A protein has these predicted regions:
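Glycine-rich phosphate-binding loops that contact phosphosugars or nucleotide phosphates
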Residues: 33-113
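Cofactor-/ligand-binding subdomain signature composed of acidic, glycine-rich
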Residues: 1-32
Length: 113
């Protein structure tokens, strides 16, 4: 593989694993408060990742969940997003306009992002 940087990949995984404790705290808090459903929000590559996460979760869990393309959600909305919805997203830059607007809309619709 050209330009493959093994150390960069290892560092990336290790950084993600270092967040596990904090992620578990957040999940425990959400479970204690209760939730209705989970929405994976993405655009482009992060939407593709959201679809993969959705498929994996459906395979292992009965939790109500779905994936939304951020641009479509901003344009058309989704009646399933509201109070009790947990929105999970990832963003490479944190400034993709569709994602920024999608987060604002989800919050306005009553979801926890």
């Amino acid at each position: 593989m050209l330009k493959f940087d093994e150390q960069k990949q290892l560092d990336s995984v290790n950084c993600a694993l270092a967040l596990r404790g904090r992620i578990e705290e957040i999940v425990d808090s959400i479970c204690a408060e209760g939730y209705k459903n989970i929405c994976w929000l993405g655009i482009g590559g992060t939407w593709a990742s959201a679809l993969q996460a959705e498929v994996h979760m459906k395979e292992k869990s009965a939790i109500e969940l779905f994936s939304e393309n951020a641009a479509e959600y901003v344009t058309t909305g989704n009646k399933r997003v509201g109070k009790g919805t947990i929105v999970i997203l990832s963003s490479v830059t944190g400034s993709t306009i569709e994602m920024v607007e999608g987060v604002k809309k989800a919050q306005a619709d009553g979801a926890k992002v």
